[in-house]
From Swiss-Prot:
Example of a GO biological process term: glutathione metabolic process
GO MF term list: glutathione transferase activity
Source organism: Musca domestica (House fly)
InterPro entries: Glutathione-S-Trfase_C-like, Glutathione-S-Trfase_C_sf, Glutathione_S-Trfase, Glutathione_S-Trfase_N, GST_C, GST_superfamily, Thioredoxin-like_sf
UniProt EC number: 2.5.1.18
Keywords from the UniProt entry: Transferase
Record protein name field: Glutathione S-transferase
GST C-terminal domain ranges (all copies): 119-241
PANTHER family reported for this sequence: GLUTATHIONE S-TRANSFERASE, HEMATOPOIETIC PROSTAGLANDIN D SYNTHASE
Assembly: Homodimer.
Domain GST N-terminal: 40-117
Catalytic reaction annotation: RX + glutathione = an S-substituted glutathione + a halide anion + H(+)
Positions contributing to glutathione binding: 46, 77, 81, 87-89, 101-102
Length: 241
C-alpha cells in the first residue's frame, strides 16, 4: 500500500482536527501534559504465619503486585499494636493509609487483580461463598482456641461429626455445580481465598479436612498450580501455620 501523505496542518484560525477514537487529545497550548498514573504502594502487616494473611498474599502473587510483607514478631507487637486501626492484624497499608478486616482487604485486592464478578449479582455469588467459608473458619476457631480441655473435647465431637461435614458437603456440591469452581463457573477470588485459608483450618483441627472431598481438593490444587501462586508457595517463609 502506498504511503499516506501527512495531514496538512490546520489553516490559521481553523480548529485542529479532533483526535482519533481512543486517542487522548493533545494538551492545550501552555498546558502541561497529563501526569503518569501514580503507582500504589502496599504494605501488609501480620505475624510470621500464613493464617488470615495468606489469602491476601495469594492475591498479591496472582496479580503480580509488589508489596512489603512485614512479619511482626511477638516481641514487636505490643509497641506496634496501638498504631493499628483496631489494635489487631492483618492490616493493609495502601499509599500510607492503613485498613483492617481481612475479608474486605481480600475483596479490594480481588477487584484490583480482576477476580470479581462482572455484575453486582455475580459479585453477590462470590461474596456468599467467601462469607460461608469465613463462617466455617470461625466455627472451627471457637473450638480450637477453647482454653478448657474438658469443654474443648465435647465441642470437638460436634465439630468433627456435624459442623465440618455440613459445611464441606455444601461447598463440595457448590464446586460440582460450578464446573470445578466455588462460584460463577470460573476462577474467582472465592477459589483463591479458600486455597489460601485451608492450611490454617487444617492446622486448627490437626488433620486434612478435604480428605473425603475431591472436588474441593481440585479447587485448591488448581489454585496452587497457577504459576504466580506456585512461585509464591515455593519461596514463602516456611511456618507451621
Amino acid at each position: 500500500m502506498a504511503d499516506e501523505a501527512p495531514a496538512a496542518p490546520p489553516a490559521e484560525g481553523e480548529a485542529p482536527a479532533a483526535p482519533a477514537e481512543g486517542e487522548a487529545p493533545p494538551p492545550a497550548e501552555g498546558e502541561a501534559p497529563p501526569a503518569e498514573p501514580v503507582k500504589n504502594t502496599y504494605t501488609l502487616f501480620y505475624f510470621n504465619v500464613k493464617a488470615l494473611a495468606e489469602p491476601l498474599r495469594y492475591l498479591f502473587a496472582y496479580g503480580g503486585i509488589e508489596y512489603e510483607d512485614v512479619r511482626v514478631t511477638r516481641d514487636e507487637w505490643p509497641a506496634l499494636k496501638p498504631t493499628m486501626p483496631m489494635g489487631q492484624m492483618p492490616v493493609l497499608e495502601v499509599n500510607g493509609k492503613r485498613v483492617h478486616q481481612s475479608i474486605s482487604m481480600a475483596r479490594f485486592l480481588a477487584k484490583t487483580v480482576g477476580l470479581c464478578g462482572a455484575t453486582p449479582w455475580e459479585d453477590l455469588q462470590v461474596d456468599i461463598v467467601v462469607d460461608t467459608i469465613n463462617d466455617f473458619r470461625l466455627k472451627i476457631a471457637v473450638v480450637s482456641y477453647e482454653p478448657e480441655d474438658e469443654i474443648k473435647e465435647k465441642k470437638l465431637v460436634t465439630l468433627n461429626n456435624e459442623v465440618i461435614p455440613f459445611y464441606l458437603e455444601k461447598l463440595e456440591q457448590t464446586v460440582k455445580d460450578n464446573d470445578g469452581h466455588l462460584a460463577l463457573n470460573k476462577l474467582t477470588w472465592a477459589d483463591v481465598y479458600f486455597a489460601g485459608i485451608l492450611d490454617y483450618m487444617n492446622y486448627m483441627v490437626k488433620r486434612d479436612i478435604l480428605e473425603q472431598y475431591p472436588a474441593l481438593r481440585g479447587v485448591v490444587d488448581s489454585v496452587n498450580a497457577l504459576e504466580p501462586i506456585k512461585a509464591w508457595i515455593e519461596k514463602r517463609p516456611q511456618t507451621e501455620v
